[in-house]
Amino acid sequence: MLIHEYLDQQIEYEEKYGKNTLVLMQVGSFFEFYGVNNKEEKIGNPCIITELLNIQLTRRNKAILENSRDNCLMAGFPCHALKRFIHILLDNNYTVVLIEQVTPPPNPKREITQIFSPGTYIDEITNYNPNNIVSLYLKEEICYKTNKNLYIFGLSCIDLSTGKNYLYEASFGYYDKNAYYEEIYRFIETFNPKELIILFEKMNDENRNTIKKKINLENRLVHFTECDKKFYQNQYQNTFLKKIFPNNGQLSCIEFLELERKPYVLISYLTLLDFSHEHNKLIIQKIKKPEFW
């Protein structure tokens, strides 16, 4: 039953973060992971990951050669070695979902305690290296004066090592579409993010392929997603931001951050903060007031 629940979670988080996702589950003094790779079904990447980590791949029942949900592929390592293996996985652009035992045996309760990703993992550092994550919100509007397309973006960047963050919103006319993509490219190249979130109001293969062609996404960890509808609601926006910026006097959080006239970068910024918070609730406690780029 435990392994079936694990496999369901592996499927869920692969759908959310992409194929380079690994769920690690604590089982006693080990962290284990499981998978299925047969003609009917493929769950996880246990064969690739064991080679990456240089550990042994086995099956739940070694006497049965075929693997399945009931005889899954499996591997693991001691809990005390977690930090070393996390580094290897992150260096290879994996997102790691950590499930730990939060109550004592014999029937421990397990919970997701952390989600590690290349842009949100903060380790003890002696030499400063930027740990930037960037969120890009792309939007097309129809200009009421010309009835032509207007191309708008909201870009936000957080360096989770220092808490510094930068916001940028700009719009371009239908005749300036190349400049639109060039400006996005310039921002991304400047901050060189470890992770990039690209947001669409409605995502499809066409707009995803277009942005891939227009800006250089080679060797970058990219998450394509649709905007969460709750981030369009003014009340939710202020309530969410208040948790991060509680001291804003008589102003609303949006006014305090000077975002009342920048709705597109506001969506980008909220998504980025939410992504960071989801991975590690402590990570955004040192976020500073954003600067405009």
Language-model region placement:
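Basic, polar low-complexity surface loops/patches
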Residues: 1-293
